[in-house]
Every structure is written in C-alpha cells, then in structure tokens.
From Swiss-Prot, chain A:
Species the sequence originates in: Schizosaccharomyces pombe (strain 972 / ATCC 24843)
Keyword Protein transport attached: no
GO biological process, one term: regulation of double-strand break repair
SUPFAM superfamilies linked to this entry: WD40 repeat-like
GO MF entries: protein-containing complex binding; protein-macromolecule adaptor activity
Assembly with partners or alone: Component of the DCX(DTL) E3 ubiquitin ligase complex, at least composed of cul4, ddb1, cdt2 and pip1.
Function comment: Substrate-specific adapter of a DCX (DDB1-CUL4-X-box) E3 ubiquitin-protein ligase complex required for DNA replication during mitosis and meiosis. The DCX(DTL) complex, also named CRL4(CDT2) complex, mediates the polyubiquitination and subsequent degradation of cdt1 and spd1. Involved in the regulation of mitotic and pre-meiotic S-phase progression.
GO cellular component, one term: Cul4-RING E3 ubiquitin ligase complex
Gene name, Swiss-Prot/TrEMBL: cdt2
Protein name: Cell division cycle protein cdt2
From Swiss-Prot, chain B:
InterPro entries named in the record: Beta-prop_RSE1/DDB1/CPSF1_1st, Cleavage/polyA-sp_fac_asu_C, Quinoprotein_ADH-like_sf, RSE1/DDB1/CFT1/CPSF1, WD40/YVTN_repeat-like_dom_sf
Any one of the GO BP annotations: transcription-coupled nucleotide-excision repair
A Pfam family hit: Beta-prop_RSE1_2nd
Subcellular location: Nucleus
Gene Ontology molecular-function annotations: DNA binding
Subunit field text: Interacts with csn1, csn2, cdt2, ckn1, iqw1 and wdr21.
Protein name: DNA damage-binding protein 1
Organism: Schizosaccharomyces pombe (strain 972 / ATCC 24843)
C-alpha cells in the first residue's frame, strides 16, 4: 500500500524507495532474455525445487504458465517530514506498530545519490583560489579562505523573497582580509562565536565573529618558540572555546589556551604557547610537515595528528605528554599494504569520536578506531574516481557520522566530491559531479547536513540532500538542461 | 528532586499471548502494555485480571512456550535493550516467578533489523528464535530433559542461546514452520533492489548451525508470514495471499489492505488447542476476516470471509466459543463475540471493553465547578476519539431492566429492612413492584394505577404506604387502600412524619394528617415545587420566582419567610446537617442554576447564597441517602452529585451520562444503593463512595490532532486519511471541528485545502477567536515550504467563520500566546505575529537550528524545541527576537515546557527527559550562552505534549508538588512533580530500599531502567519513581518492615511502617 508512510519510516526514512528507483538504471536486459520484465504484468515462476539441483539458488526461470500473480509495481512516494512526524506522534503506522528506534528514523536519510547543487548554490571567487573552508557548528554559515588571505562568509541557506522557487540559495554575507598570506585552514568554535584561521605567515588568528576583529594571534613570525613555517591547520577544542591546537610545516604542534596571559606589542595581542611539540612526526631523522592536528570530540586533552611523510597517525594526550620529551599516547603501525610510504593529507573524526578517518596520498581513506590506534586501520574506503593527489585535498565526516566526503574525485575530465557510506560493512560510494571543472580540494559539512566544496576553478558549491525530486530527476535529463547543476552519481 | 508518577497508566496493547499459564486446564491471556504484563483468566466469556507485573524495561514482544517437563506454559519476554527473560506461574505462591533471568544478546557493532525485533517459538516447542540485528539470528533451545528439570528447583527452561548468521539483511518477516524433523524458518526479505523473496532455513541445534533449505520463492510481495500446519507458509502480501511449500506454490487475490495481526482459531476442546486450518486475520482498516485454506493433493484453495469491523488490531487472540480478543494501540481493546453460523447472528458483539486512550496527540485541562477534566485527542486513523477523563464517582450496573418511557420512580421500605416497594411512574400510569428479599420482582396490582405518581413514602411509623398521584392521595396498609380524591389535579406533594402536604392546580396548598385535611393556604401563583421538612415547615417554590416557607401548627398555617429569586425555581430539596439545627436548601432554577441557602433555626443565614451553574436546562434535584454523605443528585445535561466534604462543597460528575432520573435504593442482598433510568432501561446500580478516574468517549470523524477550548466550545483539529486502493494514493484531509461543551456534539466545522495538514491551534486572549496553523504537504516535496495562519471565530448562529488568513513560508508546527502576541514555530524559524484590525503582522523572526517542534513561553522567555537539536532560549526585547542561550547537544525533542525560573523540561523521542538550566549569572559569556544539563532521566514513553498544569489540587501537607502533565504515545498521562528539598532524601532512600528488597521480574534493575539513555552513553537518573514507591502499599507487613529497616544492605530509615504507609497514602493523593 502506498499510503503507508510508516513502512518507509521503518526503512530508515524511505531508503528503500530510493534504492528501488535508483535500481531502475540497471543495465537493460534484452527482451529475449528469460529475466526480461514484462511491461504490465510480470509472470513469475519458481525453479524446480524437488531434489538437489545444481542451479544457483536465486535464479528465476521463465515459464509461460503463470502460477503466481503480482500486482503492478507502483513506485512508492517518499516519506515526508510532516507525515513522518505525524506517524511518530501516533506511535507507528498500522502495519508496523513496532519500531523501537522511531526517533532516529525521522528525517534519517542515508542515500548517497541524493545530493545535488543548483546553479544558485554555486559562487565563484574571482582571481583567487579558495584554499580552505569551514562551516559553522550551528548555523548555515560558511567561511571560505583564499590564497591571498581573504576570508569570505556565506549563508548557505539564504532564502530570497523574490525567488519564485522559494528554495534556498547561497549568498555572500561579508568578507575581510584576515592575513596577508594564504590561509590554510579555518575553524569555528563550537558556539560559533569565534573563528580561527591559520596562514602561511606562520601565525594563526582568532577572530570574534560578531565584530570581525582579531582578538588574538597565535604565533609570532620569526620569533623562536613559535611556528617557524606555514601553519597548516588550527582547530578549536569541542568542549572549550579557549583551547586550540595548531600544526605547521616545520613539524611542530602547538597547544594554545586563550585564558593564559599573552603579550601585547603595538596594540596587537599575541598568545603564548602552552605546549610545543617539536618534531612531532620525525621521519628517519628529518622533520616533516604536520598536515593535520585535530581534537577528538568529547575530549579536552586528546589530539590526533598526521604528517606528510608517512601514514602514521599519532594521538597526543595532554594529560600524559611530557613537556621536555613529548611522546604520543598512541601511534598507528606502519602500513604493510603499499610499497612505499604515502603521506596523510587530512584527518577527521566521526562526531562521536569513535572513528578517525585519514585521507592518504595513495588515494585510500583509512578508518581507525580512536581507542585502538595501535592495532591499525579497521576499514578502508576506496573508489576508482578518488585521486588524492595534493595536500590540499581534505575530507569531512557528516554530523550524523554516516557519510564521509572527500575532495579529489576525478572522472572523465570532471572533478567532484566523493562520498562514502560509513555505516555499512561493504563500502558504497558516489561522486558529486558536474559542479566543478578543476580539482576539488576541501569539503565540509554543515550541522544541517549540507555539504560545501571548493575547487581550483575558483568555485564554491553547496550541496543539498533530497530524497527525490531534484537529484533523481537530474540524472535522467540531458546535458543542456542540467548545465551548471551538480548531482551525485553512483 | 523530580518525582514522576502516573495519572493514567499506559493502556496501549501491542502484544498479547494466549497460553495455559496459571494451570494446565484453563486458558490465560497475557497482555503486554509498554512495561507492564497483565495476566487475565478466561472465564464465563470474560477476561478477568489475575495479576499484573511491572517490568523494569520496555516490552518488545512476549511469547509462550512449554518446556517438556513443565505442566504449564512459560513465557519469554523480549525487552527493548535486546535482552530476554522468562517467567512462569508459581503454583505454591500463586505469583508470577522468574525463570531464566535476564540474558543479554546485544551486539553494539551490528545494525538493528529494520522490521523491528521478532520473537518466534517453534510450533513443536524445540527452539525460540530472536531476530534483532540484520543478518543475525539468536537461537534459544528449549530445555528437553525431564530429569534435570525435576531435580533442581531453580530449573532452567531454556538452554544458553547461540547466534547464527543468515544472508538476508533486510528481513520483512520470519515464521517458524511446522517441520517435525528439524526446527525450520521461513524468511521473507528484500534484496538490494527492493524485490521481495522468501527463503527457508533449517536449524541444527546440536551443531549450533543453520542450513539453507530448498523451499524458495522469488519476487513476491512484502507482507506477513503465517505458517501452515501442512508445512508450508502463507504470505499475506499487500493484495495477494501466497501459499508456498515444497510442493505447492499458489497465489490468490484476496486482500484489500495489508494485514496487521492474525491468530489461529481455537477449537472448543482445550485438549486439542489450536486449530490452524482456520485463522482470524485483521487488516489495517480494522476489518476482521476468517481465513480458511483447503488443501488437496496438488493445490490449495484459500478463502477469506469478512467478519466485521473492530479496532485496528495490533494483536489478535482467538478464544474458545468463538470469542476473539483484539488488542489495539489505536483504540479500545475489546473482547468480541464472533458471528457464528449455528447461532445465526451476523454481528460482532462487544462483550468487554478495555479502555485505551493511546496515542494521545494533544490534551487540555478544562476546569469547571465540578472539578478538572482532561480532554485528550486520542486514537488514530479510523479510530479517532476525544476522551474526557474525569475524577468522578463510578456507577456500576448490577442489573438492567429494559423499559421505556419512565418519568420518575420511588422506592420505599415497607415493614422491611430494605426497600421492598418500587413505584415506576410513567406518563399516565404507575406500576408498583414488590421486591422479595432474594431479589425476585413481582408486580403489585393494588398500588398500580392509571395516573403517574408524584411522591411516595411511609407514614404512621412505617405502617402504611403513602402514595400521591396526580389525582389522589392513597394510603395502603398492606391489604387495603384508602384514598382521598382531589378535586383538581395535584402538581406536587411531600410528606413528613404523619403530615402530608400537596399543591393542587391554582396554587392551593393543602395540608393533611393521613388523608384528613387539616389546613390550606392559597398562593398567588401556581406552585412549581415543594419540600416538606421537619418541624412542619414546607418550602414552596412558586412560578413567580419566589420561595416561601410555610409553617404548619395547630393554630393554622402561617407564612414565616419568603425569598425573592431572579429565576423560577423548579426543584427544591432541603438537606439537613447531621447533629445540627441548620441545613441547606437546594433550589434548581429553570436556567440550569442550583442555588444553595444555608438555614439556621428556620432563618436564612445572610450572605450564604451560592449559585452554581450546572447546565442550561432545568435540573432535577434528588436526595441521596448514604451512610457517610448527605448528598444531593443533580440531573441536568450531566448527572452530578453534590455533597459537603469538610465544609467544602464538592460537585462531582457521575460516570454514567445518559441518566434521566435517579433515586437512592437500598438493597443489601443485591449489593446496590441506587436506581436510575435512561431512555431505554432502568438500572439497579452500585455507586461507589470514592471518586476514581473515568473516561468518557466522544467519537470524532477522522482523528483529532490538536485541541483548545474556550468557555463554551472545544475547537479540535482533525485529520482524515482517505485511501484509494486502485491508485495506491493517500489523501489527507484536515478539518477544524467545533464541539459544544455541554452536549459534546459537533456544531460546526471548517474544511481545509487539499494537501494542507493542520498542525497547531490556540485560543486568543479574547476567549473568542482561535488561530490555526497549517502546513502544505505537497507530495513532491520533502519538507513543507508553505503554510497558513488563520483566525477563526464562532458566529452567533453557531457557524465557524474565517476572519483572517496569512500565508507563511513553511508549516506552522506550533503556536503559543505571548502576552498579546502570537508566537509561531514555522519550519526552522520562530516568528512573532500580531493580530490587529483583522490582519496578521509579522513583528520579528529568528532562525532556529533545524525544525521547530514545540514552543513554550513565560514572562520574558520563549523556548523553542527543535526536531534534532534540543532547545533554544529566545527573548523578545525592543521588538527584536534574540537568542539568549542554546543547548548544543543533539536531542530529538518532542515537547518542551518551562518548569520554573530558568529551568526547562524537554522530552526526547526515545523516552528520555532532560531538565536544562540557564545560568544567566555566570561570569563567562560562553557559559551564559550555553544551557546546562541539570537533570536527565528516562520516562520510557515518547511524550507528545507537556503542559504546566495540575489535575488534582495538591493539599497543604503534600510531599510532592505537581508541576507538569505529560501525555504519551502509549496512552499514559504522567505527573511530573517536585519532591522538595526536605522530602527528597527520605524518598530517595525509600526508593533505594525498595529496589533492594523487592525482587524484580527477570532480575532487571530499576535503577538501570530509569537511567538516561543517550546515543552512546547511559547515565544515572535523577528521579524518584512514584509508581515504584506506590507499588509497595499492598505488600505484607514483614516486607514493609524490611524496607523500613533497610534489608539487603539498604539504609535503615528513620520511620515506622505506619509512617511509611501514611507517606505512600500522601503520595497517592496526587492522582485518583
């Protein structure tokens, strides 16, 4: 029965409906084939099941005489939020009065082929390359930073009253020059009141978002004891807006606490490091660039770091780390799968902090358990289209932890984002194509499940997920109609 | 500390089993309600509750099985945290006892099955199968050896479980087949292309393995599996029914709706048990069918016979004698008599009703003179109702006599210690009935006459019956009849001791001693009513809106007092206070008021007049003689009882609403104390002395979603689902229906547009207008992007009229009144509107995280609850909505209410509740902007609506102050209260001691049950569970002693058992 929204509900918010639709795009079978579907009434039969037969179990043998009837399959409409809420309020639908996890099914969407991006959700940066981006934790606010040090703020869900379609578009809100050098990472504090940027000028800055004023600088150029090379990443701690960690090409990781005293020189405030770990990832005696240092969520003391020289991830715990000779709390073992060492371009964690994902230069994403780093990776995500060719390629885990997005997708001269489903054992992936023409580098998720990506062609795109309508229809349209649109493809 | 107790316990039934639980010779029905198991016995065509067991977990499924050596069936209970345990009946103790204690089969790494947990028992009682996770079956072998069972008392009924892998991930349904050689399963599943297949497995218990069987079927329909005794399995698809076995595979178009429940029918012979050639099947539309399958050598013929309509069933249990128990989540559960061909009745007959008010979508509290009542929006789909829950006096019918046209009746005790004469007064006839001590009724022709009777009593020291009819005054001494025939028709009459007083047409009042006239008094107008009280005082109500008091003595009749009223008196009753000179005169007027005058020594006490409106039609007042109460019945639109309880007037509704007239009637041998009549019958009934919760049902077309009320009407937002089978489409229709409060009948409605879903309603400050918020739910859109705000008002000719309409960009999920403004939650925003001069203006709006579910306001704060992201605190200052604080935790909120200053109570979709605290004095800004989790606990049910109100006013000495009332999906109403600083330690310790002393079912821990359950964490609960504490009141003294003394390593309490009892009695006063 189609009216049964609850059935869809019990299927992870209508997942089944979409898969059935998506699977219509299976390779067509010739009409002469035994498995050819009849247009109106399908005729079905069973394979002979008496005695032991060698035939494969699930093959359908065609026979003229119909024994079983089946009504015409009518496509089921997707579950809608309002109806799902109604069903939840009534305690389930009639056929499935029992679903223990009613709540999680409402609005739970797990289909990778639902992403699309409209032309109105694409913004071009003129004459400068976007280098990094970051979503606010509670708003649909997107910060994009460029190679020249400009910081631009966008609203990814801007509702325009004049817009007839009444759909949100992306709109620039504000922008300022944050650094006089390239910005490599941008990060919002958990409550979105502060914004931190890390730059090629060997410093990081913390901005008050309401006034857009730099309230403090992390690092001093040319002064000993601070970063002596480009700062690759700066991150706020999840639980405290005062704790930050930054990492640099000089191989050091520095912990900052904004509650400590700093120094003020010429009216500019500089923070002092709380702890500096030099040579955090030493590779056969040589320093190597630290590509990523990120806090574990739900922790104020643990940081995961990666480097450009090998695949090792290190977990630093502030509670145990020695100030003179710091040693990591845990290190991942060497990979035995590949012949040579590949660096890790970026590391991200799942929202619950249980999983760590590392994008490696060998174009594989490795999944580690944050509690058992020593035992090596537990899962890999691969896709032939994924090419992690530069250290600018970043990855991000969705706020529900179910989807992993990574830049660097390449397919037939088009570039895009590759998304993976992290909930299943067999990895399924899709690529968001059509949105960018050059290499896609960084990606990030908003709290509402929107995805943003930047590309070397100067474009910033916002991707939305919808169960039906846009994304599904786009694939069937011809090229001219979907010009400047982006959509996901299996 | 938060104290939570039930006002109304959950009533939704999702599971039930039929087994021989208590003894091997009779059947029991065991019903599972959220966390409560109820054991019923099936006797005399009724289900009688034997016992109920509170389980400290949410029951997911219950099944019965029979270990070989046990004479009775055991039951296995699967709980929501992927655990199971068994229970059996201990014949020595006559209680439910634990069998296998809790077994955990949870696997955190696996994904839960999408069709929900399934619990299955092999028809040959070899294994039990549990399917919780995708691709994994947990097999629990049933104990076979008789020997070990007999030797140890703590006998195991089940072996340890083991898990086996199956290939099918997306399982729709599983059935255990009738296969005598090995336990086998049929699995209906969907593949990755959403095509449905059936495969079969055989379980090898010894090797702990599962083998694929050769019966398979491809590309069938999603549905339910019913195993057949012939070894195959029926698949009830969405439209077709398939039979699949090794040899036969057939299908037939039979169904119009998917089925929800089925039960094999029961043969009348208890030895043979189930008769699985015939099944009773219920579908989504609430229709019941009899399903028959006829097997021949090569084929099966299937037949579906319609039986009738009932509640939408979540479980069915066929009982002997063609009875059927229908357990329902959406409406009352019922025991039905199925039509049978032999008895030649074709209708479903309801034998027993089990009230269920689930799912409660919304509720309001309505206060009037008679106390509070809760009106809930209950039911869903076709079974929508409004339920009016009152704390009222329950009337239990003992015997019914079908009889029409009765106007009034009188009972009198004539030379007996019980009321042996009943006079039934019809329009132009009186029938007298003599009741023998054994309760046999026989007519008395001497006293029956052609006129209707006005008054009956006994005079001359109970030696004669006095009967006043419209024509004469008659005296009957048991043999002979004496009478005085009136020249004019008698309008009213009354007597006291040996004196009789009647009023005849023309306003003449005559006084008699026996039937000898002793005096008369001429009034100005006709007499409407009269009441003879002691000391020869007569109160007379006149049509000139006066009440006069006549005193009769030897000298004559004198007017001693007169009262001028504004309305015409219709019925007068004088009620004396025991042991006092004073009394109260109750006067009902022609417009539904009841006036009360207090008299002292024959004088009206000044300023003692009280007016109570009990209806709009004239009210009949009648005296009710009871041992404890001097009570007055008031019969208008609603029957009510008025009495004084510690000098406070209490007006309580009666549970039966169709009463026309009422009279007290004492007959101890029948166990009745009253007599009442309706349009169609007279009932001898027993009225209880104490009030209890009674539920009145008002059926609604469609199902109600939201409700609000003003002083005259209930405004109910309803939805209707119209389904068409052919196109498989579903239409949602929405209505605003207006119900009159007194008559509870629908007087007006407004139909909304197609695709428009009604979401919210509030009453505006002026008590007249209502604002309705809707959302358009077009089929091709994921989330609503448009909606309307509408203002309605009732016109003078009882029509509902739309006054204003305002289009908004989203669905108006919630509306509240903030001062004179309207706060609306529209999709992911909160907007403030002002209604002025017939139009709506937007004053301001603000974005909220994802989707606003509920809003609560107090003086200066607006709290918005979000679909996924907990709550946000907003303030409206200088025409600007600003965000003051927010909770950054993920929380799937369902309702929010302000608990006290800066404390917010939020309920969550998984049954948790959190109290959040706003710290507005913290020195750090980030702390001020962040809400803190103050307390968190588990309530166990999804709460749809929380309101700040109390149903029963707390008394001064109450240990707990009630604060909130929560309505849940499972039909319970919870009281959330505060135990106060001084009482908390004692109650907490008491709770702790009870946990330690009272053994729990299945060895479950009450502490764990009330723990907050987050996605990844559980944490101890800050909660005092009232239902746990109250549950010990009925326990025996030694156990109470142990609780007080802190047995089992508890803490010794500083109170006596008597104190404990009074504490619990105090706590019990929170709810009826």
């Amino acid at each position: 029965m189609n009216m049964d929204i609850g059935k869809a509900l019990s299927d992870v918010g209508g997942l089944r409906d979409i898969t059935s639709r998506a699977n219509n795009s299976l390779p067509p079978t010739p009409d002469s084939s035994p498995a050819a579907p009849s247009k109106k009434h399908k005729l079905y039969d069973f394979l002979e099941s008496r005695g032991k037969i060698e035939t494969p179990r699930k093959r359908i043998v065609f026979e003229k005489k119909p024994l079983l009837h089946k009504p015409v399959h009518i496509q089921k409409k997707p579950a809608q939020l309002c109806k799902e809420l109604l069903i939840r309020q009534l305690g389930g639908s009639r056929s499935h009065p029992f679903s223990t996890k009613t709540s999680r099914h409402v609005g739970g969407r797990l289909n990778l082929e639902t992403y699309y991006s409209r032309p109105s959700e694409c913004l071009m940066m003129l004459n400068q390359l976007p280098f990094c981006l970051g979503f606010a934790n509670n708003e649909s606010l997107l910060a994009v930073c460029t190679e020249t040090g400009a910081l631009e703020l966008f609203d990814s869900r801007f509702y325009d009253r004049q817009n007839e379609e009444n759909q949100p578009s992306a709109r620039r809100i504000h922008g300022w020059l944050a650094h006089n050098n390239a910005i490599f990472s941008v990060n919002f504090s958990k409550d979105d009141s502060l914004l931190a940027t890390s730059s090629g000028d060997q410093t990081s800055k913390v901005f008050d978002l309401s006034t857009q004023q730099c309230i403090t600088r992390l690092g001093r150029r040319g002064v000993d004891g601070y970063h002596s090379h480009s700062v690759k990443q700066v991150n706020f701690c999840n639980d405290s807006p005062y704790n930050l960690v930054s990492c640099s090409r000089d191989g050091s990781i520095i912990f900052w606490d904004m509650r400590t005293h700093g120094i003020t020189i010429d009216g500019e405030h500089f923070q002092k490091p709380v702890l500096r770990i030099r040579k955090a990832h030493e590779n056969s005696g040589r320093d190597c660039s630290i590509t990523s240092a990120t806090w574990l969520p739900q922790s104020t003391s643990q940081v995961i770091s990666s480097c450009s020289a090998n695949s090792a991830l290190k977990l630093w715990d502030l509670r145990t780390v020695h100030t003179v000779r710091p040693l990591p709390a845990a290190t991942t073992p060497e990979l035995t799968t590949s012949k040579r060492d590949f660096g890790v371009t970026n590391v991200c964690t799942s929202p619950d902090g249980e999983r760590i994902y590392a994008a490696s230069r060998d174009s594989i994403i490795y999944e580690y358990s944050s509690r058992h780093l020593n035992s090596g990776f537990c899962k890999t995500y691969k896709d032939p289209r994924l090419r992690i060719s530069s250290f600018y390629v970043k990855l991000a885990c969705s706020p529900d932890g179910a989807t992993l997005a990574c830049g660097g997708g390449v397919q037939d001269k088009t570039s895009g984002v590759v998304v993976f489903d992290t909930t299943r054992n067999c990895s399924s992936s899709a690529m968001l194509t059509g949105g960018h023409t050059k290499d896609v580098t960084a990606v990030d998720w908003s709290s509402e499940g929107q995805l943003a990506s930047i590309s070397d062609d100067g474009s910033v795109r916002v991707w939305n997920s919808s169960l039906h309508g846009s994304a599904a229809n786009l694939r069937e349209k011809n090229f001219s109609e979907i010009f400047y649109w982006g959509f996901s493809e299996k | 500390m938060t104290y939570v107790t039930y006002l109304h316990k959950p009533s939704s039934i999702r599971n039930a089993v039929f087994c021989k639980f208590v003894n091997a010779s009779s059947w029991n029905v065991i019903v599972a309600k959220v966390n409560c198991l109820e054991v019923y016995s099936y006797e005399n065509n009724r289900l009688c509750l034997i016992t109920s067991a509170n389980i400290f977990a949410k029951i997911v499924n219950v099944k019965a099985f029979k270990p070989v050596s046990s004479p009775t069936d055991h039951i296995i209970v699967a709980t929501d945290s992927f655990r199971y345990f068994t229970l059996f009946w201990d014949a020595n103790d006559n209680t439910v006892s634990n069998g296998i204690k809790i077994q955990d089969c949870s696997e955190r790494s696996l994904r839960e099955s999408q069709s929900g947990p399934l619990l299955l028992v092999d028809p040959f009682q070899r294994v039990i199968c549990l399917h919780v996770y995708q691709g994994l079956l947990t097999i629990i072998p049933i104990f076979k050896s008789k020997k070990r069972f007999m030797t140890s008392h703590n006998n195991p009924s089940l072996h340890d479980n083991f898990s086996v892998r199956i290939q099918e991930l997306n399982v729709v349904d599983i059935a255990m087949l009738y296969n005598s050689s090995r336990p086998s399963l049929a699995v209906l599943y969907k593949d990755s292309k959403s095509i449905v297949h059936l495969s079969t497995y055989k379980i090898n218990v010894r090797e702990q393995e599962i083998d694929e069987d050769d019966v398979v079927c491809h590309d069938i329909e999603e549905g339910k599996l019913i195993p057949s005794e012939n070894g195959g399995v029926f698949v009830f698809g969405e439209m077709y029914v398939y039979y699949i076995s090794k040899d036969i595979q057939v299908s037939k178009l039979l169904l119009t709706y998917p089925i929800t429940a089925f039960s094999p029918s029961i043969s009348n012979d208890p030895e043979t048990g189930l008769d699985s050639s015939i099944y009773i099947v219920a579908d989504e539309s609430g229709m019941l069918y009899k399903f028959k399958a006829l097997f021949t050598d090569e084929t099966v013929s299937m037949e579906l016979e319609k039986l009738g309509e009932s509640s939408i069933a979540s479980c069915l249990i066929a009982l002997p004698d063609n009875h059927l128990f229908v357990g329902s989540h959406f409406n009352n559960s019922v025991l039905l008599q199925l039509p049978s061909i032999t008895k030649n009745n074709h209708k479903l007959e309801i034998l027993q009703n089990f009230v269920n008010i689930a799912p409660i979508s919304d509720f309001i509290i309505d206060d009037d003179q008679t106390g509070s009542s809760i009106i809930t929006c209950s039911g869903a789909y076709k079974d929508g109702t409004l339920r009016i829950i009152r704390n009222s006096i329950n009337i239990e019918n003992v015997a019914l006599i079908e009889m029409e046209g009765i106007k009034d009746f009188f009972s009198v005790s004539f030379r007996a210690n019980y009321d042996n004469y009943i006079f039934l007064s019809l329009i132009c006839e009186t029938r007298a009935i003599i009741v023998s001590p054994e309760g046999v009724f026989s007519a008395n022709h001497d006293l029956s006459c052609e006129e209707s009777t006005i008054f009956v009593s006994t005079i001359y020291g109970n030696s004669q019956i006095l009967q006043i009819t419209t024509k004469e005054i008659r005296l009957f001494d048991g043999k002979k009849l004496h009478s005085w025939i009136s020249p004019m028709s008698i309008t009213c009459g009354s007597s006291f001791a040996d004196n009789v007083c009647v009023a005849v047409a023309g306003g003449l009042i005559l006084f008699f001693e026996g039937i000898t006239e002793v005096g008369r008094y001429q009034c100005d107008t006709e007499v409407s009513s009269l009441c003879f009280t002691e000391e020869n005082v007569v109160y007379v109500g006149l049509w000139s809106a006066d009440i006069i008091m006549l005193t009769y003595c030897q000298d004559g009749i004198s007017l001693t007092h007169s009262l001028k009223l504004t309305d015409i008196p219709r019925s007068i009753v004088y009620s004396q206070k025991y042991g006092d000179d004073g009394g109260t005169l109750y006067v009902s007027t022609n417009n539904g008021y009841v006036l009360m005058f207090n008299f002292q020594n024959g004088q009206v006490i000044e300023h003692s007049l009280r007016r109570n409106q009990l209806g709009v039609a004239p009210i009949i007042l009648k005296h009710f003689d009871s041992k404890e109460k001097n009570a007055i019945f008031a019969l208008g639109e609603k029957p009510q009882l008025m009495y004084y309880e510690s000098d406070k007037l209490v007006i309580t509704p009666l549970s039966c609403t169709e009463m026309l007239n009422i009279s007290s009637y004492v007959n101890p041998s029948l166990g009745v104390n009253m007599l009442y009549c309706t349009n169609s019958y007279i009932s001898l009934a027993k009225m209880s002395e104490i009030r209890s919760l009674n539920v009145q049902t008002v059926s609604v077309k469609g199902f109600p979603r939201r409700i609000c009320s003003n002083s005259l009407f209930y405004f109910v937002l309803c939805m209707q689902l119209e389904e068409s089978i052919g196109t498989q489409e579903q239409r949602l229709l929405s209505f605003l229906r207006v119900y009159e409060k007194n008559t509870l009948s629908e007087i007006a409605h407004h139909k909304f547009n197609e695709y428009e879903m009604v979401e919210s309603i509030i009453l505006m400050n002026d008590d007249k207008r209502v604002v309705v918020g809707t959302g358009f739910n077009f089929p091709d859109q994921d989330a609503p992007d448009s909606g309307r705000l509408m203002v309605f008002e009732m016109t003078s000719d009882n029509n509902i009229e739309m006054q204003a309409e305002h289009k908004v960009q989203g669905s108006v999920n919630t509306l509240v009144l903030y001062k004179h403004l309207i706060v609306a939650g529209i999709n992911a925003s909160v907007c403030i509107f002002e209604y002025e001069h017939g139009t709506m203006h937007v004053r301001n709006s603000i974005r909220t995280p994802t989707y606003t579910i509920d809003i609560s306001v107090n003086q200066d704060e607006i709290i918005a609850a979000d679909l996924m992201k907990s709550i946000t605190v907003l303030q409206f200052i200088d025409d600007q909505l600003i965000e003051v604080a927010r909770d950054y935790h993920p929380l799937w909120a369902t309702s929010v209410e302000i608990l006290s200053e800066r404390k917010y109570f939020v309920t969550e979709a998984d049954g948790n509740a959190v109290i959040l605290l706003r710290d507005n004095v913290s020195p750090q800004l980030s702390d001020r902007k962040k809400l803190r989790w103050y307390k968190k606990f588990y309530l166990g049910e999804l709460i749809n609506k929380t309101r700040h109100c109390t149903f029963i006013e707390p008394q001064d000495k109450s240990l707990v102050t009630p604060q909130l009332l929560c309505a849940t999906v499972d039909g319970s109403l919870m009281i959330v209260g505060d135990a106060g600083m001084s009482n908390t330690p004692l109650l907490l310790q008491l709770q702790d001691n009870i946990r330690k002393v009272i053994p729990s079912f299945g060895g479950l821990s009450h502490k764990e049950w009330k723990e907050y359950r987050g996605e990844n964490e559980t944490s101890p609960s800050d909660l005092i569970d009232g239902s746990l504490i109250e549950s010990i009141l009925g326990l025996r003294e030694p156990i109470l002693n142990e609780i007080v003394n802190g047995g089992h390593e508890g803490t010794k309490l500083d109170i006596s058992v008597q104190d404990l009892k009074s504490i619990i009695e105090n706590l019990e006063k929170l709810h009826p």
